[in-house]
Amino acid sequence: MQIVSISSLKGGVGKSSVALGLVSAALIEGTRTLVVDLDPHADATTGLGVRAPSGRNVGKVLGKRGKPGALRTVTVTSPWAEREREEQGKDDLVLDVAPGSSASSLFDRAQYRRSDLARLERALEGVDTDYDLVIIDCPPNLNTLTRVAWAASHKVLSVAEPSLFSVAGTQRTMTAIAQFERGTRWAVNSAGVVVNKVHPDSREHQHRVEELDHLFGELLVAPVLPDYQVWQRAQGAAWPIHRWPGEDAAEIAGRYSQILEGLLSAEP
């Protein structure tokens, strides 16, 4: 089982969109997937069509100080999987969600306590028999919840957009990962940068992608992700991009499948 955190320093770069695109690719490939929505805004939960019962959210698990295996008590099945099973006749598909909620914000302090960092790691104990992939959607900051996610993860993907401010933010994120490893007992085995919302015809965007390539080299994940309106329509309908019609949707879906293949082919 591979555990991957999707991080960003600020909102607006499409962090949750990247998480949803990877989940869509995993669903189509038949990869048994669990989504842990640590973002108090719960955009990934909404995008996956999940309406969780009251009290059934990841904040409840964190409040138990990371009881071993506790995440199983709050997971629900995404309608994406239910629909795919019905329409494609694939009864063995697995896509579960540990829903996000504003309750998680109680733990998202700027200054973290070392005793808090293992909460999610412990809550995930034992789920490796149920899933091949865990995607953690982090809050758009570098506070406690993001570091709780890093402590539980094998890999971290930092989402950037091709802008001056995002390039600087990505540098700070990668520096923070290195500092996290030096200052705690946890090690992130792999980190990468995904470039989202790229306008292929924009010289400014081309320049920023080249700048990111220069800064991060092999850590820059290929391919980049274009900013097509069809992706917004698919998300608005809470629909997997791999099942949305049209050439633009197919192109985006193919790129997410490539990124997922790279993630799963590397050792955790």
Language-model-derived ranges and their functions:
Residues 1-268:
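P-loop NTP-binding core
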